[in-house]
């Protein structure tokens, strides 16, 4: 009886660990597909449509942390998608390249929660000039879609470099 009980407990623990990992893997694949679609959008100059809205929940929020906003700035889904399209309209190209992905944890329980953390390197290009920068994101999911992204990057440095290139 003890042996059966211990086997059941061990199997339950193993199943719950795999279940968390499965959520992470599924969400990670979803996020990687989004990055691929964003990169493709910028690579092909004739591609005008950006069909990435379905990657996000309707109440998606992008949180950024520029200088002067220690609690961050919230950007809703519509404005976030418009800002990506606006970059292309300004002849700015973006490529998200080098990335390191890690599973995220719940901020209260410290247990794996299916979220994705990513350290990335990106390049913004205008004509033949490039601006390279790094950033960090935490990405939360709800029912397989991106609910929120928190991003930390050197926005001031990127902005200064863009101003120099656009003179």
Give a label for each model feature.
Residues 112-122:
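A short hydrophobic beta-strand element
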Residues 117, 130-137:
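Short, surface-exposed coil-to-beta transition loops
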Residues 148-167:
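Low-complexity, intrinsically disordered terminal/linker segments enriched in charged
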């Amino acid at each position: 009886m003890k042996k059966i009980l211990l086997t059941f407990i061990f199997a339950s623990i193993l199943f719950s660990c795999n279940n968390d990992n499965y959520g992470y893997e599924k969400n990670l694949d979803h996020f990687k597909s989004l990055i691929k679609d964003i990169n493709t959008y910028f690579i092909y100059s004739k591609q005008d449509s950006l069909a990435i809205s379905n990657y996000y929940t309707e109440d998606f929020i992008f949180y950024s942390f520029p200088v002067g906003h220690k609690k961050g700035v919230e950007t809703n889904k519509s404005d976030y998608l418009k800002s990506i399209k606006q970059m292309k309209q300004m002849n700015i190209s973006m490529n998200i390249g080098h990335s390191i992905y890690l599973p995220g944890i719940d901020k209260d329980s410290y247990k794996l929660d299916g979220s994705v953390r990513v350290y990335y390197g990106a390049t913004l290009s205008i004509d033949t000039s490039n601006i390279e920068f790094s950033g960090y994101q935490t990405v939360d999911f709800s029912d397989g879609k991106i609910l929120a992204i928190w991003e930390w990057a050197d926005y001031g440095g990127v902005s200064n470099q863009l101003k120099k290139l656009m003179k």
